[in-house]
Amino acid sequence: MKLPSLLSLGVAASTTIVAAVPDQKPIGDTIEDVHLGKFLIELGPGDTRWVTEEEKWGLRRDGRRFFDITAEAEQNVFPKTFAQTTVTFPSELQNVAHVKKLASSLSKNRLQTFLTKFTSFHTRYYKSESGRQSAIWLFEQIEKIIQESSATGARVEKFEHPWGQFSIIATIPGQTNKTVVVGAHQDSINLLMPSILPAPGADDDGSGTATILEALRILLKSEAVAQGKAPNTVEFHWYSAEEAGLLGSQAVFAQYKQDNRDVKSMLQQDMTGYSKGTMNAGHVDSVGIITDFVDEGLTNFITKVVTGYCGISYVLTKCGYACSDHASASRYGYPSAFVIESKFEYSSKLIHTTRDEVSSLDFDHMLQHAKMTLGLVYELAFADL
């Protein structure tokens, strides 16, 4: 099938497009393969291939991650890369007392209550009706949090896609358009039969969705943030279609690049609730800070945030190419980072099955991710970036 165009890249107007990836196979003048029911995926820099939808899911079942870049082929703008934005992050934490006071109001009960409902949708597969309904419900929860706060100018908007499930963007305006982003993906998938079988997706990525939602709720309790007094704008993103090749986040950041948005940082929270793998391996509970395909400066600052605001430590780990939505931000030149629940090899093996349920999650561990998210967003909202 032919995937509808997602990305309007404005190539002629862009001044940040640089040389294509070396040794990348060029796309010809036609994209006939798309009309033959195939999709163009990128499994690594310079590693592209046309695959069927079933072959996409087969690669996912084998643990392979990729960008689905079919839309770029349709726009005839592939291959390309973007110049990376250079940002100097703070050398030290500046708001410890205030953030810790805010963090004391983070609620495990709210995390669990939210996830109990969120995982009750049959699946949050991005092309399913229940995936659309889950997005509507999530949007309503975000809308309610903003309405119940004293925030001035805060808003939540739908970012529509050609498929049924939209992405969601909540914005807290600051004094400038410099923007700090945290994200999670709202979709789930059962890789055995994506369109049919249940996919509760409690950890992947209901946990990240709940984590950043709770961080948003508490951040809005800061009068300075809620009244728009922070120097920088803050956005919370919940992406559609991550499991299908980072489709939702690619569309969002492609639009941001076209609009010349000044995104200073992006943190992804994907899988924040499973600690049994670490414990069963005989290790101390910790969060996993990803070190490959991320921005080094932002990642180094996150280690300071974890040390300053979390009750557990961190381990450094790798997850590979295009392993979550932060990769889309990086693809379009924005500094990005990713924090996961553990060292990558100890992360949940229940994901993408019917067994990825709330009962497998550690809400004390998830609360640490919420503290880290809140701390990072608050620090960067008030930083000179």
UniProtKB/Swiss-Prot annotation:
Intrachain disulfide bonds: 319-323
Organism domain of life: Eukaryota
Keyword Glycoprotein: yes
Coiled-coil zones: none
InterPro entries recorded: M28_fam, Peptidase_M28
Leader sequence segment: 1-20
Keywords for the protein's UniProt record, in alphabetical order: Aminopeptidase, Disulfide bond, Glycoprotein, Hydrolase, Metal-binding, Protease, Secreted, Signal, Zinc, Zymogen
Cofactor note: Binds 2 Zn(2+) ions per subunit.
Pfam families given in the database record: Peptidase_M28
Primary location class: secreted
Broad EC category: hydrolase
GO terms, molecular function: aminopeptidase activity; metal ion binding; metalloexopeptidase activity
Residue sites binding Zn(2+) 1 per the record: 185, 204, 270
Listed cofactors: Zn(2+)
One cellular-component annotation, GO: extracellular region
Residues glycosylated per entry: 177
Localization terms from the record: Secreted
GO biological process: proteolysis
Binding site for Zn(2+) 2: 204, 243, 352
EC number: 3.4.11.-
Propeptide: 21-87
Stated role: Extracellular aminopeptidase that allows assimilation of proteinaceous substrates.
Stated family: Belongs to the peptidase M28 family. M28E subfamily.
Summary of subunit composition and partner proteins: Monomer.
Protein name as it appears in the record: Leucine aminopeptidase 1
Name of the coding gene: LAP1
